[in-house]
């Protein structure tokens, strides 16, 4: 009896213990399963993808990662705290849905912040806390707060997590997206490590000069001031040292450009210091490592100063200052703006506000102001005359009503449309009258022009164009003359233009070499003599040889505070990116060295072959090939011509912009035409003196107070011999022809020479005068010729018209080939080099035609009929057939992922491994789950026995193995399930086995208890 009782008690204890132990195992392993996803070390995301977490140290790093999804955005804010603990505690309220690593190739859209603790207030929807231990015994608490989570989210960026190699070292990493440029710039913000050496700079010479060394500046004509410094530095300069100087707020260094920059300081081609524009008008230059070991350093610096239209809105005197090391350089300049174009009834004015070459966009402001009476049926149009993108996007046009007095309108054509006290937006009210086109044009209809309106335009231009010309035109009809609607209308036209080009002048062109000498003197510490750096280089260079032209080398545009400085009209700015040694950074002070009042002057023959000036200024420079004339401002009596100067100037960089004045203003009233002529002026730093001798007579023909001077323009070899000069004073037409070529040798048969250089030749007008200069030489024939010899030359057939501000200049150099030897039968030589020649237009209506055509020389003995034809039309190259695309790398098929049950708590079997490199395919892991609902153990994993405790200071092995699998997953093109789930961490498999083991314990215990009860009953 005692044995039975003892056996029953033993069974009772064993059964109760089994039930208790099994229950604890089941409950404990279940919680461990839920918390496994968050039980890992804090991961730091690095931009280069390198691992940044090392468990050997006790440092804590925090990473906030925002992942952009296709449908919604989910972000996790992780906060890490350290608490000393030697135990692992798990507390779970709810397990969040897992987000799978994407397996489709999508654009990267992950934004990361490196080593920055997130201080935002969390709005927890799911809170999960895991306390795991590392080798230092620290406890880390991680809060994951998903803002939104859907099963349809698909990440666009691959996330790779590296497997920990040891139990005490874990280095997960996440690939960084290209969309984090802003965060990258923020983390890599430039920090000055050098010393401020402004106090060590001595200003030996400092000056501010106006346009052409005057005290006047016309911003709308592209004029600006120039700051000149000659500086001396104390010894001991090092890399990173910098000095500052500050400009007054009425000027800036960028004009209408959105790019704010200043030229580099160079010694030859070596950059000694880089410049940057800071806030508050401060300019900073930072020395490079080339300044090391230099003593007795002196430098010269020149910087363009543009009048700020936001600060200086009216005409008048302005004091411009620059302060360096407490020494102030100042100059008082007279600023004058243009008034636009207008008549008795209305006025039209406009200017380019900003210009951004980086994205091919610009903005423009136009003022439409009524003067006297009312004008009805007004149409305002904005058109890109040059640089239009026919397949572009529609511009953004906003209409504002000006609420102030017309007398208070800024002369600088500046409009602060954010000031609601002066500007009221009425775009929505006029939406039915506003028409926008994809080519960048717009049209606005105004029923009654009884208020002043401002039209703000923001559009794009054609990428790669060398000129942008935007025309604003207004057509109106005075109200009191409405019955004469078709006869009494008027038109106002206002042009604003920018010229961008890459000039390839080599310095050996028509105007001679353009050399810029930059001085940078210093001494080395190790030698006694002085070393002088000399930089002799063409002012204009090829931009491709210096910098990538896509980065816009325009120097000047909008103000720092966003107001925007600008100039109207054709103002050409060329920046030479490697043009200045420390003394002259680019050629920023071109107008101070050589200037003109009006006309058109080109410094490079390659891009503009004819250089001439149209000027009445007595101090302007002239060259040997200048054509100078005076224009009757009212030749016909019914035409009113207003001349506005268009200024083109060269900067030191190859790529540049033209910002500036007005061109092509037309007013028509009472059947009379009002025309504003635009003359393009290019200001070049130092245009070389042109020397030479003209042979032959020089004729001066004066008629109707028109003075036309012709020099002896030579033939191709540089000499002009004129034995026959015909002067025809009919309709002011002057024809100058050179002598015909000579004949030598014996000629048999009929010899016929025909030359028709005037067939279908259009009229060329130059200020009411036609100047026609032809140089045509009939071929020189040597030897015996038999048969009929015929030479025909027609170099002017179908030649288009060339206009240059109403003035046409035509210079032809045509030579028929020289034929030597014996020729029999008929010889026919035809040349037509101008057939269907396209039209070229420079500036507004200014055009230049320069032709040099020489046919090849023919030598030898020819029998039979000889026909020589030359057609300069470029051959048509047949298109190259497309090369068939060959895949560079074979694609490795990816086995489909097993289907997963819909319950979020059911674990998903791991995806079979896919080789990371296509060229070395590897078979997937052989494990295949028996049932979709049950997990499959990964390869090389030993399940833990429940009785074996986890060692202190080591990471659980299942987590490590699963991390490796996540890393091995490569993106595939197969569609993925839209279900979101947590990544498998490896704890799942051991958890299930533990739960099974615990369940068996419980069942065994219950069986023993039941048997014990039966024994008691018995």
Swiss-Prot record:
Residues 39-61, 78-92, 129-139 have a biased composition (Polar residues). Residues 879-948 are annotated as: 5 X tandem repeats, Pro-rich (WR). Transmembrane segments: none annotated. One of its GO terms (molecular function) is fibrinogen binding. Changing residue 356 to G: Small reduction in fibrinogen binding and greater reduction in elastin binding. Its main location: secreted. WR repeats lie at residues 879-892, 893-906, 907-920, 921-934, 935-948. It is a peptidoglycan-anchor. Residues 986-1018 form a propeptide. Residues 1-36 form the signal peptide. Residues 112-126, 827-838 have a biased composition (Basic and acidic residues). Residues 512-872 are annotated as: Fibronectin-binding. Changing residue 304 to A: Significant reduction in fibrinogen and elastin binding. Residues 37-511 are annotated as: Ligand-binding A region. Keywords: Cell adhesion, Cell wall, Peptidoglycan-anchor, Repeat, Secreted, Signal, Virulence. Residues 545-604 are annotated as: 2 X approximate tandem repeats. A motif (YSIRK-G/S signaling motif) lies at residues 7-18. Gene3D superfamilies: 2.60.40.1280, 2.60.40.1290. D- repeats lie at residues 745-782, 783-820, 821-859, 860-878. Residues 38-61, 78-195, 595-622, 740-813, 827-997 are annotated as: Disordered. The modification Pentaglycyl murein peptidoglycan amidated threonine is found at residue 985. B- repeats lie at residues 545-574, 575-604. Changing residue 357 to A: No reduction in elastin binding. Significant reduction in fibrinogen binding. Fg-binding activity is not regulated by the divalent cations Ca(2+), Mn(2+) or Mg(2+). Deletion of the Fg-binding domain of FnbA abrogates the ability to promote cardiac valve infection and persistence in vivo. This is Fibronectin-binding protein A.
